Amino acid sequence: MTATSDLEVPSPADDETPELVPLDSLTAEHTGRWTFLIVEGAAFMMQAMHPVIAEIVGRYSASFQGDPGGRAIRSIDSVLRWTYGGTEAVAEGNRVRAMHKPMMMKSAETGKQISALNPEAYQWVIATGYIVNAQGGRLLIGREFTDAEKAELLRDNRRLARLLHVPMRGYPETDQEMADYFETMIDTLQATPQALKLMDDLITGQVELSPSVPKALYPLIQVVLRPALRLNYLSIVGLLDPRLRDKLGVGWSAEEERQLTRIYKTIRIAYRVLPDRFTYFPLAYHARKHHQCLEKMKQRQQKSYAYRVPGTNTP
């Protein structure tokens, strides 16, 4: 950790126009699924293992201030706007940066000023999204992603990084660079109190419910949520690097791997059978349908007799 003045992300230039994630991309196909919320839990765990991020979220995040469910929903809302929001995506990127700018504090570990916009930490937040998704191919699609697919995922991850004003100097440009970057981060990541709290909640199946929920219903809700909480645990721990599991003091058995694989095989079958309306978040569903409708219109336009006239340019 270094001083905030040395580490804060520079303000974006006014003439920078970030590219948006294509709505027919792999990123758009998978980010909008309901299981994204579960898979991304592994990314959040890795973020909580970064010392700067851990201290900042420990002070400022609702995850550790009595509203973890609300924080998760708002985070997913934000990610969906980055990916499917169109012009709103740019506004959301600006909002996220502005929201994090005032989050500064004196580190209890080093005594130095730290910031939510610490470049190393801010890069790590976005990089974990790629790392988890690239490693999650066996769960998401039933096989490892190909090199070409990983290149596409990283391309869109870099687009999101720019959208969120992440400093791009040193940000990985290839899958190999990302792998090397991950190796350099292993020693930085720690079993922070925040990460250990998250892991303990996963192991015990504890859920902090909204104060509006009657306490008499807590036991029933815990029972109803037990299968989902087990899936959450398996997904997060199963996607963590073994070295990170060791730091957090958790193991991973062959039986747990088989159980996780079986569950996601069932989920993939359900996704193939169920209509998209039931498998995607509403914003993702409507954005993808809107894009598909426009693409079909373009295809119909190509059949116009006017395009057969010599000298006519096809748009």
Where are these regions (language model features)?
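Mature, function-bearing regions of proteins
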Residues: 1-315
